[in-house]
Amino acid sequence: MTPTKQTTLLFFLLIFSIYCALTIGQSWDEETELLRGKITLEYLLSLGDVDKKILYREYYSPIYWSLSYLLTKIFPSQFQIEAGHIINLFFSLSVIFGIGKFSKELFNKKVGKLCFLILFFYPIFFGHMAMNNKDMILAL
């Protein structure tokens, strides 16, 4: 496959994933995740003075929650869910590119491209790319 065709394929894959991230809608726990991010950001900015207990704080990355909350606050409130999906998509695509580069270093260029395509088209991973912020960051 020529580099022009590869770039075109990559462009359409990225556009398709952005389209899916924007049209997927709100999941049942996204408001809770934003609230966790708000509480964690208050904790970090107060240097530990505001310490509210958050369920599962020790199991998942509270830094990611606060970063996600901070970035979604940049956008208007009616677009916070879509902004969160784009942020999750960015980290998920980073995982895909990272695993592709890692397998390219371990094996060869063909295996790296194959791993990239398999992971991108794997339905469970692709379905969770935009809405699941817990598992994708652990894969990173």
Language-model features: locations:
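Membrane-embedded helix bundles of polyisoprenyl
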Residues: 9-14, 87-90, 111-125, 136-140
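Membrane-proximal lumenal/periplasmic loop motifs of glycosylation machinery
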Residues: 22-28, 46-69
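Transmembrane signal-anchor helices characteristic of membrane glycosylation enzymes that use polyprenol
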Residues: 5-30, 38
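Loop-to-helix entry region of an early transmembrane alpha helix in multi-pass inner-membrane enzymes
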Residues: 58, 62, 66, 76-94, ...
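Hydrophobic transmembrane alpha-helices
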Residues: 68, 72, 96-104, 123-126
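Hydrophobic core segments of transmembrane alpha-helices in multi-pass, intramembrane catalytic enzymes
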Residues: 33, 39, 92, 138-139
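Transmembrane-helix motifs of polytopic, lipid-linked glycan transferases
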Residues: 11, 83-106
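Transmembrane-helix signature of polytopic, membrane-embedded enzymes
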Residues: 4-9, 78, 99-121
